Amino acid sequence: TDSETIIRQAMENLNVAIAESQAMVTYDALPTVIADPTQLTQLFQNLIGNAIKFRRETSANVHISAQNQGNEWTFVVQDNGIGMESEYLERIFTIFQRLHSRRDYPGTGIGLAICKKIVERHGGRIWVNSELGIGTTFYFTIPV
């Protein structure tokens, strides 16, 4: 599965949100991986969509890259959004877990749980680093 084609599809699916928020989504040259294209599209769509949803007053900037780590590819999805405190980083992958009220940020609280399930189904791992007020970086692996 060509990762760049997948990201373009995810961006097309999010084209209204990207246009309305004036988000900038960029990516480096990305690998071809053995993965279900529909699930990989959903994974990127959820991560990019969250970056747009949880942006600061300025427009969202999202950058996607990948590095070969020998037996796996590590994908990095980095944004300049509102970020979150470190105490919440593990909880966000739990289904229906929300850090904000629906009034502040719409959503169901299942997107990142779906991301985790997709990555695990492909034999990978997903984790996050974040700094409140600076942004969030999601990492996930897909075996080579």
For the regions a language model picked out, list residue spans one by one.
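Glycine-rich ATP-binding loops of the HATPase_c
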Residues: 123-129
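Short alpha-helical Gxxx[C/S/T] motif in the catalytic ATP-binding
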Residues: 111, 115
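Short conserved segment of the HATPase_c
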Residues: 84-96, 138
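Short beta-strand/loop element within the Bergerat-fold HATPase_c
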Residues: 59-71
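A conserved beta-strand-to-alpha-helix junction within the catalytic ATP-binding
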Residues: 1-12, 63
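Short helix-loop "hinge" at the ATP-lid/N-box region of the Bergerat-fold HATPase_c
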Residues: 51-52
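Glycine-rich G1-box
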Residues: 16, 82-83
